[in-house]
Structure formats: structure tokens, C-alpha cells
Amino acid sequence: MPLIHINIMMAFIMSLVGLLMYRSHLMSALLCLEGMMLSLFILTALLALDSHFILASMIPIILLVFAACEAAIGLALLVMISSTYGTDYVQNLNLLRC
């Protein structure tokens, strides 16, 4: 396995550990999720280039679309929580009612 693949996997694992450690604030959780999605995007793009399979080149683009949707929903929740409660604690997510 090339060294770049190991580095990207380590970046994913570090983002996952950061998500598990700093889960009290929503902004920290969103940043860790974005780090995970970025490392997954780079890893799938590298694997698609290595495989020389035509349909494999669509997977990173689909992953990027899901990452953009996740970021938009996360930022909308962050704005809603911040304007309602004044803080970005994840425990306030249980208090939101539609």
C-alpha cells in the first residue's frame, strides 16, 4: 500500500477520534465530519485513478455531493441552535421542535 493511502487513512482516523472526543459542540463535530468527508473524497479519487475503471470515477463526485448536502444541513442546524439558545451545544439538538 502506498504511503499516501496510509496518510489519508490516518487523517480519516484522526477526524473520527476528534469527532468522538469533541462532540459537545456542534461546530467541532461539523469540522471533524468535514475532515472525514475530505479524506474519504481524496481516498476514493486516488483509488478511482488507480483502478482505471470508468464508472469508478463517478464515486468521488457523488461523495462530494453528499458532503455538500451534509455541510448545508449542519450549518442550518448550527444557525438555528445559535439563534435560539445562544450556544452551539449538541445537547440543545434534543430541545429543537418543528
Curated annotation (Swiss-Prot):
Keyword Electron transport: yes
Domain of life: Eukaryota
Major subcellular location class: mitochondrion
Cellular component terms per the entry's GO annotation: mitochondrial inner membrane; respiratory chain complex I
EC number, UniProt record: 7.1.1.2
UniProt record similarity statement: Belongs to the complex I subunit 4L family.
Record-given protein name: NADH-ubiquinone oxidoreductase chain 4L
Taxonomic source organism: Kogia breviceps
Lineage of producing organism: Eukaryota, Metazoa, Chordata, Craniata, Vertebrata
Gene of this entry: MT-ND4L
